[in-house]
Amino acid sequence: MKKFSIILILFSLATVSCSKMLDVQPTDSISASQAIKDKSGVENAITGSYNALHSTSIYGRYQVIVEDLAADNLIWTGTTQDYSQIANHTIAADNGIIDGIWSLNYDCINRVNNVLSRIPDIDMNTDDRNLYTGDGLFMRALCHFNLLCYFGGIPIKTQPTVDLSSINQARNTVPQVYDQIISDLLQAEQLLPATRTLGYASAFSATALLARVYLTRFQQTNDPSIAELAIEKASKVISNGGYTLSPDYAGLFNGNATESIFEIVSDVQNRTLLAQYFFPRSLLGRYEVSPPANFVQSFLLTDTTRFIASIAFDTTKLPYGFKYKDITAGTDRVYVLRLAEMYLIRAEARAYSNGNIEDIRNDVNVIRARAGLDPTTSTDYNELKLVIENERRHEFAFESQRWSDLVRTKRATTVLGISENFTLFPIPLSELQTNTLMTQNPGY
């Protein structure tokens, strides 16, 4: 993996408008201006950027698994040693999975930047220009936010990396990265349409991601004005987005899309291998990860709806993650943003800023009611914070949320028993070797 970052730069330059892998020699490489020369080229490049989110290292596998494996919803039960390091919080700088998350998020950013740099020169109508610009800004913000949550301050990339001479870039500060993410999303919110085909971002996708970003920034700064922004954006999605909670939790993973704000759509061309990594070997899976006993036992006896949709057992009573079921074709949907999160974002922002107790309970109880649980009646802020944490743990199990939840609320050190340094992942060795201005995170 040592030269993975350089390889990805070359690859993205050679395939800027492609949605498929091509075997291209360096002499065949073409510039963005050559590849993206009309509206069709822009559309293809945007599709290729969305497909990059589907890559193995982002929502196709690694990032989804790492969020629960680095926390307490999954344990390592397979043969891939890089997963063992993540589960045991002994991550080396040359860990291939962490390297992949870093490199492929930046690859998606570079693809988007190539498109955004060309859009002003392409002849197209205003609606199309706004649409594709909004797409690019949304994806750039999402990938920068992924990297920020895992690595802290990172280099902000808003221009294409056109050759290897431009890879040396120092880390921006955490506030600077937040400012860039928020700026991109506020623009995307204005440029994108209110409704969109599944798998593509809408204006409300940008609003929902803003709610998540504001909540995370609030938890780092304790600035109540930022909590209000998180509440405002979550409320906008809840009230105006036209989404409805799936009446049946299991329906979320069996075709019901009324709750989906943004998701990764899988098909035979863009498969996800998540089911293979969760399913036991008796069911032809790899069983690289599995829910530990303490997580299995953490579900309330009345929380049967979420339990049955999340965890299953083979004939030997071996537990395994069950949200991703298509082990043959790999067409499982992967949620990035859905409506339930907006209720819990609003509840968390209010709970941590001493908001109205009844409003907090109401939002939590919407989610509990769907799960078939009795409403919480707590009147204590600290109790409600733990109720929200617990709801998120079970509501979003295996949906790329748990690690970020614990780090955001500063609970990772207590819940996981790790040092503060290890709430960030190491900067990959490949990046340190190729970017002379990069510095490693403390403790690695």
Q: For the regions a protein language model found, what residue spans apply to each?
A:
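Membrane-proximal, proline-rich intrinsically disordered regions
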Residues: 18-65, 91, 375, 414-444
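Short, surface-exposed recognition loops and adjoining beta-strand edges that mediate ligand/DNA contacts
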Residues: 32-33, 60-78, 165, 193-209, ...
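Elongated scaffold/linker segments in the mid-to-C-terminal portions of large proteins
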Residues: 82, 86, 96, 235-355, ...
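Bacterial Sec-dependent N-terminal signal peptides
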Residues: 1-27
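Conserved, well-structured interaction surfaces
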Residues: 43, 51, 81-151, 187-196, ...
